[in-house]
Curated annotation (Swiss-Prot):
<dbReference type="InterPro" id="IPR036249">
    <property type="entry name" value="Thioredoxin-like_sf"/>
</dbReference>
<protein>
    <recommendedName>
        <fullName>Phosducin-like protein 3</fullName>
    </recommendedName>
</protein>
<dbReference type="Pfam" id="PF00085">
    <property type="entry name" value="Thioredoxin"/>
</dbReference>
<comment type="similarity">
    <text>Belongs to the phosducin family.</text>
</comment>
<dbReference type="GO" id="GO:0005737">
    <property type="term" value="C:cytoplasm"/>
</dbReference>
<feature type="region of interest" description="Thioredoxin fold">
    <location>
        <begin position="45"/>
        <end position="184"/>
    </location>
</feature>
<dbReference type="InterPro" id="IPR013766">
    <property type="entry name" value="Thioredoxin_domain"/>
</dbReference>
Length: 184
């Protein structure tokens, strides 16, 4: 009888090994898919990319979440905004960050009603869902916190928290808790 108990125990151990192997295999497959997706994002995301008017539609409609900065090269506030957007682009790979010289994209500046620079237009699945004009939402000052910009983009629903790098500017929980207020 003790030999049967020993054999039954060994059979259960082998069953556990099979289950662990299946779980391990599934996890490895999941990690490979995540790595492949991250590499895909890195090839098209992760930077503030300047585009021209003829690439605008392709870039905006080809990704779920897009932030487009309409700028003028001589405006200091546009340069300030660029620096913050470059940092956010490196941390939120699931959101594409683009910039367009407004002088060279008159068709889209007209269609989107852009009259003040800088202007950020937020796109979700190719549709303009929101915009941020100038620095008014940041207290009208040049030294706004990058967290304020991240919260603003998040409120538009286009800041992807699922596909991020190790660098952390802000978390989804910070946005929910409104952790970074304008008067901080």
């Amino acid at each position: 009888m003790s030999e049967n108990n020993t054999n039954n125990g060994l059979d259960e151990d082998f069953d556990d090994d099979d289950e662990l192997a299946k779980i391990r295999e599934q996890r490895m497959k999941q990690l490979k898919e995540e790595s492949k997706l991250k590499q895909s994002f890195l090839s098209t995301h992760g930077e503030l990319k300047e585009i021209d008017e003829q690439d605008f539609l392709k870039e905006v409609t080809g990704t779920d979440n897009v932030v487009v900065h309409f700028y003028h090269s001589d405006f200091q506030r546009c340069k300030i905004l660029d620096k913050s957007l470059e940092i956010l682009a490196k941390t939120h790979l699931g959101t594409k960050f683009l910039k367009v010289n407004a002088e060279k994209a008159q068709f889209f500046t007209g269609k989107l009603g852009i009259r003040i620079l800088p202007t950020l237009v937020f796109f979700s699945n190719g549709i303009a869902v929101d915009r941020c004009v100038g620095f008014e939402e940041f207290g009208g000052i040049d030294s706004f916190k990058i967290e304020q910009l991240a919260i603003r983009i998040s409120k538009a629903g286009v800041l992807d928290f699922k596909h991020t790098t190790g660098l952390k500017i802000i978390s989804k929980q910070d946005v929910k808790n409104n952790k970074f207020k304008e008067d901080d």
